[in-house]
């Protein structure tokens, strides 16, 4: 019985540790070139009005540009960092730039947000 408990405890610890690891960015080829995508293959974007480590996309902006949310126990790496939004939620940033998806991208590989708002939104590129 104690061996089973020890095995279950070890497995729980391993699974908990792996869920807290850093977001691993994936890349995809689009009609506008290679870009970072989320787990669903949706294009990720950066916003020129954000400063390093700070998201200014709140309210209606955040409704149209959902943040790439990080778990409370997310662990950053050298390139992938965690930014705390004004609403207290955590989001991922690549090299200090907060990452977002775009509401009007409906299928994996869509790039409708690139160049939006007079060029203030950009596909996040490797």
Name each model feature, range by range.
Residues 21-126:
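Compact beta-sheet-dominated domain cores in extracellular/mature segments
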Residues 1-8:
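Bacterial N-terminal signal peptides that target proteins for export
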Residues 5, 16-22:
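Sec/Tat signal peptide C-region and signal peptidase I cleavage site
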């Amino acid at each position: 019985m104690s061996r089973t408990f020890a095995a279950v405890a070890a497995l729980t610890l391993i699974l908990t540790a792996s869920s807290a690891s850093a977001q691993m960015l994936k890349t995809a080829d689009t009609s506008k070139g290679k870009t970072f995508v989320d787990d669903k293959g949706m294009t990720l974007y950066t916003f020129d009005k954000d400063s390093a480590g700070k998201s200014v996309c709140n309210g209606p902006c955040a409704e149209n540009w959902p943040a790439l949310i990080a778990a409370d126990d997310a662990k950053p790496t050298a390139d992938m960092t965690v930014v705390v939004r004004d609403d207290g939620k955590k989001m991922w940033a690549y090299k200090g730039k907060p990452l977002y998806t775009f509401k009007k991208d409906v299928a994996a590989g869509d790039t409708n947000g690139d160049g939006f708002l007079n060029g203030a939104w950009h596909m996040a590129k490797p």
